[in-house]
């Protein structure tokens, strides 16, 4: 295993157990079997390695969601299952739960709201493609599909910019909005 991968493996282990705030670079380096100075040959900061770990973990968990959910079921049921699955997988994951931690949230939100982050986010790309294909198959006009995807982009924007500190119960509120939006479209 190369040194960068050893750092990532050690960081994943430590962040998974302790969370972001309680983890130090010295502990990651020690667990990887290298000096702290060597850490900086591969990552410029704790934030940088955490972002790398977070992206990998988010992709892994979201891929599991893609594989586990039935994307052909009734849209209202699908939205409900999508939110429930996301809550279940994120709430018990110390790495993904850091999305709401003010100490690192800005870094994570900044990455995922950037064009690079959107393009490199396979779950986001999957949702856009899957919902677009489904709407096309159901006979929605290109204009209606664009309008609906614009609302999806608003939900994505809210996820990137509104935290629980800004708006208590934001996740539940977004779920209610999404569910009722879909109900309105299907009428």
Label each region the model flagged.
Residues 46, 53, 57, 61, ...:
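Hydrophobic/aromatic residues within well-ordered alpha-helical segments
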Residues 52, 56, 66-92, 149:
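Hydrophobic alpha-helical connector segments
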Residues 60, 85-93, 155-158, 162, ...:
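Phosphate/oxyanion-binding loops and surfaces in catalytic or ligand/nucleic-acid-binding neighborhoods
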Residues 88-112, 160-164:
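Amphipathic alpha-helical segments used for helix-helix packing
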Residues 98, 135-180:
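Hydrophobic/aromatic-rich alpha-helical bundle segments in the mid-to-C-terminal region
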């Amino acid at each position: 295993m190369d040194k960068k991968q050893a750092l990532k493996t050690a960081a994943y282990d430590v962040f998974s157990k302790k969370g972001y705030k309680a983890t130090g670079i010295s502990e990651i380096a020690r667990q990887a079997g290298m000096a702290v100075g060597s850490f900086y040959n591969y990552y410029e900061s704790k934030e940088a390695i955490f972002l790398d770990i977070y992206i990998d973990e988010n992709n892994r968990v979201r891929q599991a969601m893609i594989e586990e959910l039935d994307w052909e079921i009734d849209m209202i049921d699908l939205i409900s299952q999508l939110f429930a699955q996301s809550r279940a997988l994120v709430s018990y994951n110390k790495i993904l739960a850091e999305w709401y931690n003010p100490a690192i949230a800005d870094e994570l939100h900044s990455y995922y709201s950037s064009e690079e982050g959107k393009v490199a986010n396979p779950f986001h790309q999957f949702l856009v493609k899957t919902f677009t294909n489904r709407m096309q198959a159901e006979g929605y006009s290109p204009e209606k599909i664009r309008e609906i995807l614009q609302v999806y982009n608003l939900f994505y924007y809210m996820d990137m910019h509104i935290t629980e500190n800004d708006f208590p119960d934001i996740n539940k509120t977004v779920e209610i909005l999404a569910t009722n939006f879909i109900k309105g479209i299907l009428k």
